[in-house]
C-alpha cells in the first residue's frame, strides 16, 4: 500500500506509510508439547508475547506521533471465541483509540473443518473427528453454556470406548487405549475465568489415524 511509481503513475493508498515488523518469539516447548500437543514443524506463539509485540508497536507509533494500523496475520482454533480473553480485550481497547486500527485474520478455513457447533437436545450428541496418518497430536476444546454440566465419552478408531469420563468440578483424567499408542488427557473446567462458561479440554498424544 506504500509503493509509489512516478514513471507509471501508480500510487498505493498510503504512499507515505512505513512498516514496523515485529518477529514473535516461539512459544515455550513445555506448552507446545505437553499442553497443546503441537507438532514441532509448526510455528506457535504465546498470547503474552503477541500482546508485548502490540505494545511495542504502540510505543514506536507514539514516539513518531503517527497513526497506526496493527495487522495480526495469525489465528487459533482454541478458546471460547467470545472476545472475552486477555488478548481480545487488549486489542479491543487499542482499537477504540483515535489513530489506531486493528486488523486480524478470521475464517478462510475452507474444508479444514476445525470448528463444530451443535446443540445437545437430548442425552448426548455424537461428533466425529478425523485424524490423519502420522499425526503428532492435537488439542480440542468443548465449550458449553452455564450452568449446564457436560461429559465426554470417546471412542477410538479401533472401537475402544472410554465410557463417560467423569470430571467432577475440575481436575485431569488420563486415559490410555490398549490397542493403540494414543494417550488422552481430559481436563474439566466448571467455569472458565475469561468466558464464564464450562469447558472440557482434550489433549491427544500420538493419536491413531481414523475416525
Q: Whereabouts are the PLM-identified features?
A:
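Subtilisin-like serine protease catalytic core
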Residues: 1-46, 65-66, 99, 136-138, ...
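A Trp-anchored, charged/polar loop motif used as the substrate-binding/catalytic surface
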Residues: 2-5, 48-55, 197-203
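Sec-exported extracytoplasmic/periplasmic mature domains
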Residues: 2-3, 55-62, 92, 96
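Short acidic, glycine-rich surface-loop motifs adjacent to enzyme active sites
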Residues: 22-24, 52-82, 105-106
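A conserved hydrophobic secondary-structure block that centers on an alpha-helix together
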Residues: 31, 38-60, 82
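Substrate-binding/specificity loop regions of serine endopeptidase catalytic domains
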Residues: 63, 75-211
